Every structure is written in structure tokens, then in C-alpha cells.
Amino acid sequence: KWYTKAAEQECPEAQYELGVCYEAGDGVGKDEAKAAGLYRKAAVQGYAEAQKKLGDCYTHGTGVAKDLEQAFECYSKAAKQGNVKAQYNLGLCYMKGNGVTKDLVQAVEWYERAAEQGLAEAQYYLGRCYNNGEGVEKDPKKAAMWCEKAAEQGIAVAQYYLGCCYEDGKGVTKDLARAAEWYRKAAESGNVKAQFALGKCYYDGNGTEMNYSEAVKWYRKAAEQGDADAQNSLGYYYERGEGVAKDLGKAIEWYRKSADNGNELAQCNLGLCYECGKGVTKDLVKAAEWYQKAAEQGSAEAQNRLGECYFYGRGEPENKSAAVKWYEKAAEQGIANAQYNLGYCYEKGYGVTKDKEQAMQWYKKAADQGHESAKEAIDGMESGGMGAAVAGGVALAATGLIWKILRI
């Protein structure tokens, strides 16, 4: 009632407060258009809070048509009057190019003004700019400093980032216990990346005691929020029976969720399950399909597995040239089995022209990683005997039966 009377007398403070009431439906019927109109009246009179609010209306299309250029103008007017939230929002406009030409230097300038007044969101974004070198030179120490200020005010994403800083010793002295502490704060606020990171701390015993049950607890929270890495890891723990009762059905369930979310490790794991009939009916065609998905995303293990599918005609038509293609991709990523397999193909002329030098080169790469069959193949080639052929037949057959679970 009194806000209305004062607003009718063009009092900008009253117009603003009445607008807040109409926007929220507090004491009056909710009316976003009326709220925006009242904000506009107060904004025209130079009232910074109303200018900022009107900017919000234009940003989100609340009570007015969405108009990012108008939003920018409103934020700019309020920011120049010292309105801290408008300064932060103006920084966002410059960072994203919303209503104005993208300008990271200007974004940093406005973030800094708001951050120095203690606005946590601005402190986090300023820290992020220093971390990424956006609008300023990279400065890990300043990045950590500003993120810590935001983290101490409860900004979960800043708490997670600060945990990463302490884990990696980036901008601060490495301290795994403090890393776990900040991950916990962020995880308890629901930050999915922090939940995964905290689960990993418990699994590895980094900064906290090793506790598989606690690891599973936090991985599950992240997995239930749709985090593909956590879903894959949870599948791994169910497959192994670590921190939970062993349950291959649930392992497959979580691997599948992760794989469907595009996680290459889970796709490879699911392929392994189908290849070995672990938790599912053995199906070499499905195994090859999942290996293909993972291989195309760059999974070296899947690339080698897919090469074997083509080499032996398991789930794919036999195609030695295709096998060599995938072996080569995996070998170049350092997979010893793939290096050995590629060497064998070069030695025997499978899918490529015979090339003893290439064969020896790849055998040596595998042998340097401790691959026993590669060592035998080298001995066989150097002695001119049949060692390589014998080793090759045995190793290639054995490779397809290896059960190798991958996890993050």
C-alpha cells in the first residue's frame, strides 16, 4: 500500500521495491510485466538497483521481450554507479559477447571491480580469467587467491577449483589434505566434479584415508547426477566388488549408462564384457560395436581390440588391412600389445607389405615396455629362426582373452 502511494509520487526507491513485490508475487498478484515497468520508471530516474533489475529482465525475458543489448545498457549504467552485481553482470556481457562486442580485457576490469567489493561470483570468474589467461596474463597464484576468496564464501565451483590447485600444486603449495578438504566442501554442496574428485581421493588414499566404501559413496552421488566418468568408475567397483558387493549386472548397468553418455573407457569396458561374456551373454558383434565407438574417440586400448576383431574376424569381417590401421593408431599411443601386433603384421605381411625393419622397430618398442612375446620375436628374428612366428601365434591368441578393466 505504502510502496504504491510512494511509487505514484515517482519515488524511485518505492517504484523499485514495488517492482520486486510484483515480480515475486509478494503481497500482490504476480505480474512480471508490471514489475518491469516499475523498474523502468525507477531506472529512468537513475536508481542503480532498478537499472540492474531491468537489465536482468531484458537478459531473461522477464516481463519484457528478451533484449541483450538493452540488458547491457542497463547493466552499464548501474555498474558505473558502483552497483556490484551490475559490475559482475557487465563482466559477463563482455566475456560472452552478450549485447556488446566480446572483450575479455573489459570483462576482467569489471570482474575486478566487483571482486574487490567482495562479490563471490566475480571473485571466482576473475580467478578463472587468471587461470586461463583470458583478458590477462596467466597467473596461477592470482587465480588461486581469487578462487580461495570465492571458495570461502561458499561458491562450490570455486571450492572444487581450489581443491584442484592444492592437488596439483598450482599457484599454491601442493597439499593433498587441503585438496580433499576443499573437494569435500564442494561435494557436499552438490558439485559433481568435486564428488568424483573426492571419491578418487578415498580410492587412492590421497589426502585422506583409503576407504573404498566412501569412494563408492561419492562416485555414486556423481554418477546419479549423470557424470560419465563416475558412472564408469562405479561400474568398475561393482565388477571388482570394491566398496560394494560384487554385482556384474550392476557393473554392466553403470558401464552402459556411461558408454551411452559417450565415455570412451566405459565403451571399451562394455566391449570387453561382451567379448568375454562377463555380466552379459557373449556377443562378439556387440563387442566390436563398442570397441568401434571407443576407438573412434581415441581410446588406445579399444583401437587395439578393434584391430584384433578385424584380424581374426571376431564380430567384424576378417580384414587384415583394417586390423593394421587400428593397431597402428593404438601402437602410436604406446600400447605394447598393439606395438607387438603391428610388428607381427609387418614381419608376416598381414595387411601390409612385409618389412623386417618395421617389424623389428615395433617389436623393440613393445619389448622396451616389458612385452615378453616381443622379446621372443626379436630373438627369433635375430637368430633367423621361427621364434617370432611361434610367439606371434600364441601372443595374438592370448591378447584377445585378456580381461583388462579400465577406469578413470
Name each model feature, range by range.
Residues 6, 21, 42, 57, ...:
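TPR/TPR-like alpha-solenoid repeats
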Residues 8-11, 24-26, 31, 44-47, ...:
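Short helix-capping/linker turns of helical repeat alpha-solenoids
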Residues 15, 51, 65, 87, ...:
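Canonical tetratricopeptide repeat
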Residues 17-24, 53-60, 89-96, 125-132, ...:
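Hydrophobic face of amphipathic alpha-helices that form TPR/SEL1-like repeat modules
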Residues 39-42, 183, 219, 353-372, ...:
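TPR/TPR-like (Sel1-like) alpha-helical repeat modules
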Residues 386, 398-408:
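Short hydrophobic alpha-helical membrane-entry/anchor segments
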